[in-house]
Amino acid sequence: LIEHSGTRRNLEVDFFGGEPLMNFEVCKQLVAYARSIEKEHNKNFRFTMTTNGIGITDEVIDWCNKECHNVVLSLDGRKEVNDRFRVDLAGNGSYDRIVPKFQKLVKARGGQGYYMRGTFTHHNVDFTKDLFHMADDLGFTELSMEPVVAPPDSPEALTEEDLPKLFDQYELLANDMLRRQKAGKPITFYHYILDLKHGPCIYKRISGCGSGTEYMAVTP
């Protein structure tokens, strides 16, 4: 990444899925190595940890708060929605195990530098209920929810019939965010963070994907 980044100073590394905490020692070693060489090459590494939460410990929390510019915490929302897919080898849902860990990590970060990231499917096209659950019941304010990517014949795949419902959900979310803003209790929705005057598209059209020159994702 350093060799191919040219004059770019800020470099992003995302520890991503599978599940990075299955190999936490390698994450620590890679960060330590990057820190040892970044000044020599006039680079500034920023690390992100994306995790399903099962492997979070006090050590992980301390390390993330010291080394990670951002932490992405995977939670699909309501318990029944999350536990439909996020299960362990025994088939047990993860919700009850991970929510307290996520809350502890976010509190230790001062409520900053994190996102709750969920995925909505054909089974929960009412995904604002999942976002509002995370905000109102769990106390999270930095939220992201993305559509599933699945084969068209998958039971989880979104359909043409789902689209009007989804459009209504995004409208509902926008209005609710305005209400919260006026009440002095705002929430952030990642995909609504847009610069209406200077969008990102022109840069992507000129330079393409930044993978390998300014950004890299590392799996276990």
Cite the ranges covered by each PLM segment.
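Short acidic donor-binding/metal-coordinating loop in glycosyltransferase active sites
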Residues: G17-G18
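Radical SAM/AdoMet-radical enzyme domain recognition
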Residues: L1-D14, N23-V148
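Radical SAM enzyme [4Fe-4S]-AdoMet core and its adjacent flexible, acidic
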Residues: R84-V99, Q103, K107-G212, A217-T219
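A generic structural signal for short coil/turn motifs at secondary-structure boundaries
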Residues: L21-F24, S154-E156
